[in-house]
């Protein structure tokens, strides 16, 4: 069983612009979730969304900035709804844009509940990167 979500997207924007969408709280909220993010290693913050009681999710994702290498890498912890994982965004200039790789790792491949959560989040990450992030970048 797999224990990670991996997505890959090409965005027709420079890495610095994509980086801002990942690290400026207002831009991050516009494509992901409301948050109190600060781009400081060690900073603890939350993302907030609608609770999903059936999955034991209170609507709060508790995070901490683990690694910050502007404008090429952001890694955070991601805990909520019974999972304790990490999310890493890697950015690389490519042609007239940016290649954005997302890795959401640390799921228990043997736990059916975590596998279900991983499937839900996998679809969400794909949709957010493909549509919502691109819309935020186009509008900012």
Model-predicted regions and their roles:
Residues 36, 52-101, 105-108:
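Hydrophobic-ligand binding "helix-grip"
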Residues 6-7, 17, 25-60, 73:
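Short beta-edge strand/loop motif at the mouth of beta-sheet-based domains
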Residues 1-15:
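Terminal, regulation- and interaction-focused segments at domain boundaries
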Residues 22, 32, 78, 137:
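Short, flexible helix/strand-to-coil boundary loops that buttress conserved ligand/catalytic motifs
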Residues 21-22, 68:
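Conserved catalytic core of Hanks-type protein kinase domains
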Residues 18, 28, 45-47, 65, ...:
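Hydrophobic pocket/interface hotspot
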Residues 106-140:
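A conserved amphipathic terminal alpha-helix motif
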């Amino acid at each position: 069983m797999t224990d990670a979500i991996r997505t890959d997207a090409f965005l027709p924007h420079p890495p610095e612009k994509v980086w801002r969408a990942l690290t400026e709280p207002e831009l991050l909220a516009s494509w992901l979730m409301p948050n109190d993010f600060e781009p400081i290693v060690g900073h603890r913050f939350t993302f907030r969304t609608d609770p999903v009681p059936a999955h034991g999710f209170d609507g709060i994702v508790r995070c901490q900035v683990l690694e910050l290498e502007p404008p090429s890498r952001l890694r955070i912890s991601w805990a909520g709804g019974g999972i304790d994982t990490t999310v890493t965004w890697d950015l690389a200039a490519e042609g007239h844009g940016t290649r954005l790789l997302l890795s959401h790792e640390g799921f228990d491949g043997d736990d059916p509940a975590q596998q279900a959560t991983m499937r839900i989040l996998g679809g969400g990450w794909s949709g957010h990167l493909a549509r919502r992030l691109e819309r935020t970048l186009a509008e900012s």
